[in-house]
Amino acid sequence: MFEDNNQKRPLYIPYAGPALLETPLLNKGSAFTSEERSNFNLEGLLPQNIETIEEQAERAYRQFMAFGNDMDKHIYLRNIQDTNETLFYRLLTNHLTEMLPVIYTPTVGKACEEFSNIYRRARGLFISYPDKDRIDDMLQNATKQNVKVIVVTDGERILGLGDQGIGGMGIPIGKLSLYTACGGISPAYCLPVVLDVGTNNQQLLNDPFYMGWRNPRISGEEYAEFVDAFIQAVKRRWPDILLQFEDFAQNNAMPLLNRYKNELCCFNDDIQGTAAVTLGSLIAACKASGAKLSEKRVAFLGAGSAGCGIAEQIVAQMKAEGLTDAQARSRVFMVDRFGLITDKIPNQLDFQRRLSQPVERIADWPVGDNISLLEVMEHGRPDILIGVSGQPGLFTEEVVKTMHKHCARPIIFPLSNPTSRVEATPADLIRWTDGQALVATGSPFAPVEYKGKRYVIAQCNNSFIFPGIGLGVIAAGATRVTDAMLMSASRALAECSPLVKGEEGSLLPDLADIHQVSRYIAKMVAKTAMLQGKAVQTPDEVIDQSIEANFWRPEYRRYRRTSF
């Protein structure tokens, strides 16, 4: 799995003594060699025994297992990350399936809620509104100079938990951990950022330990100007950056994406990443059953930016399979808390309006004005049901059984995060459909045993998509993230499905294979970027070489001392 980094050229390091031990990207702890301990003034600062990284990882894993709950395990892993990043990623790589739910969803949600209470050490940048005139200076203060990927949030819509203020920083930190662990992007290239624009969470404002700006959220023109000041400063500091918008509220997420997607290399993971992994899963599910997505009808519970983003990708795939735009949109039903979205409902957002059903199309449904999800199941007869509502338990037994009455093999994706917000549990879905439902979830669930059969539950996790996209963008030197690049990522993921390959098991690949999956997605993304003129054309073998050259591995390099 790991190559010998001692065969690579040494790194020339200007730090020594305690300063070196306190630099997470460079610290080796007990693995510093005798020569390095002498050359870098480390003698006497470390125990005598010199260890390998694997020995360190084994000790760290034993310590990890000694903690009794996932929150304590999360804090422990973050402490390792803040003291020795190479060891952190070696440990995470060795136990990715076990540790992913601890370092990211669902545990990261609780970590965001408790951010100010569990705060240990600074990581990333906190850009606060009162400091809006000094953003350029703050970017210069970043501990990492050659930044290639930024994940930024304003903390307003953290998972399904709402406004967490600067506690939302846990999400960029977690996401970038996955860029490295799953996509091989060096941690030296990754910078988490939170835009502190205040919070409307009264509990945080009243908390004496809350570390953010104690002020109601700014909005409107003030907010737009502040975000733009940040974007322009980033472009000046790192003009070739890949910037990922993360967990912005619905009223800001799509407008920000539309404003900046043609100005710099950026994407919104909640809208586009979620859409890409969901579409890849749906393509795989349809292929496994010998059908096309364009032959299916799809119902959504949740018509926010994430749900509508998924729906638009589904429409694009249906059109690629031969349907007209109108035909594809007629097969998609968006349901929000007021019922089915039709063209007669007032005050729709622009992205919702494009997906609303004309009332003429459903004129023969024997229903009232507010058409419920259950009525959509009965009269729309969808084959696919996707939940992005953030509200638990809304896929009721009656809803699911009504769907199953009209569809022998329903595809049901309750995608809301964290686990406490899921629309239905896989065990219930499988039981209510007598084992016929093909289920994928947003949070991790254990396999389900039903009538002597074991059902592996795929986690429709964005970590299958965004690390590969990031690796592909960096390897190709792409200047934009386009819809076609995202579509190529979805199709590449579908090709990696065990079910599509005729194998037993999950709809999505095993996390143990994530490096191979990310490399393949990266190559398809890079090739598409080149075809669209967003990257310089190079032969396939050069793309492969660039992907490998940019794929960082958690191994210690040899150090040589130099001066600043």
Swiss-Prot record:
Q: Where does a divalent metal cation bind?
A: 246-247, 270
Q: Which InterPro entries match?
A: Aminoacid_DH-like_N_sf, Malic_enzyme_CS, Malic_N_dom, Malic_N_dom_sf, Malic_NAD-bd, Malic_OxRdtase, NAD(P)-bd_dom_sf, NAD_malic_enz_proteobac
Q: Which UniProt keywords apply?
A: Metal-binding, NAD, Oxidoreductase
An example of a GO molecular function for this protein is: metal ion binding
Show the catalytic activity.
(S)-malate + NAD(+) = pyruvate + CO2 + NADH; oxaloacetate + H(+) = pyruvate + CO2
- Which residues does NAD(+) bind? 157, 270, 417
Q: How is the cofactor bound?
A: Divalent metal cations. Prefers magnesium or manganese.
Q: Which family does it belong to?
A: Belongs to the malic enzymes family.
Q: What is this protein called?
A: NAD-dependent malic enzyme
Gene from which this protein is expressed: maeA
